[in-house]
Structures are given as C-alpha cells and as structure tokens.
C-alpha cells in the first residue's frame, strides 16, 4: 500500500468498489510470484491510478493471523515522487484530497489505524489482533 502525497498537502486516495472491503484507502495490492516487494507496490499503483511512482519509503507494516494460522503482511510505503495522469480503475475511484480533510472521509476498515503508521514516526506496526474472535487494532 502506498500513500502518494504532494508538496501542497494533498494525498491520493482510492474509494474502493469491492464490497468485501469498501471505503477510502491508499492504492496497493498483491505481490506476484518472484516479484520484489517494492516492484509490486509500484505496479499496483500504476494499475490502480495510472501514476508511475518511485523513491518509496517504507513506513511500517500491517499484519494479522489468518484463520488457518498463516500470517498476512501488508507493507506500508509513502512517496511524493510520481508522474502521469490520475485515472480510476475497476478497483476504485481515485482522487486527491487534502491530508487535513482525510479523516472526514469514510475509511475502509482499519485504514484510520494504518494512517497513524504512515504519518507518525513513533509507530511502525499496525497489528490486527484476531484472538478470541475479535478484531482489535493495535499500534506498535
């Protein structure tokens, strides 16, 4: 997942169309077999937004345990180095908004906690604790 921002205080967001995880988030997606993680983030941003990004800075991770015991990791990057024209995709509607106004939008589940990892140097992990049938968002 990549937070793309500019020098004017804007961030690029995606209003996801997928009914299993709707709401405002940043672009991102899955890693293909034998694909470096940064390359996957760059590719997903291109596919979902039409922008070419570079100089990604790793902010932290989001992680949780799946029901089968496997661990799922999402790497959280940010960059202000991009080129191209913004376009929406089948994943969602893409648009710029002021970072100061971001929390007024309807976030996808967990996005508000992930945003803390993107913005605060005191956090590097958003752990989704799924023990005891609950979904607790923890910052580390």
PLM-predicted stretches and their roles:
Residues 1-11, 27:
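Conserved N-terminal beta-strand and adjoining loop/helix that marks the start
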Residues 11, 20, 65-67:
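Flexible, glycine-rich phosphate/dinucleotide-binding loops
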Residues 19-22, 73:
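A conserved beta-turn-beta hairpin within the catalytic core of GNAT-like acetyltransferases
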Residues 22-26, 98-99:
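A short, polar/proline- and glycine-enriched secondary-structure boundary/capping micro-motif
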Residues 31-54, 64-114, 139:
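Unchanged
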Residues 117-140:
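Charged phosphate-binding loop/patch that engages nucleotide di/tri-phosphates or the phosphate backbone
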């Amino acid at each position: 997942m990549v937070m793309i921002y500019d020098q004017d205080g804007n961030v690029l967001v995606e209003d996801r169309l997928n009914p299993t995880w709707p709401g405002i988030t940043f672009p991102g997606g899955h890693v293909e077999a034998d694909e470096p993680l940064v390359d996957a983030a760059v590719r997903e941003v291109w596919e979902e937004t039409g922008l070419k990004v570079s100089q990604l800075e790793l902010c932290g991770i989001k992680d949780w345990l799946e029901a089968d015991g496997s661990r799922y990791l999402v790497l959280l990057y940010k960059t202000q180095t991009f080129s191209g024209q913004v376009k929406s995709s089948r994943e969602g509607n893409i648009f710029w908004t002021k970072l100061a106004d971001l929390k007024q939008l309807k976030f996808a589940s967990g996005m508000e906690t992930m945003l803390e990892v993107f913005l605060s140097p005191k956090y590097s992990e958003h752990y989704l604790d799924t023990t005891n049938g609950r979904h607790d968002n923890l910052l580390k």
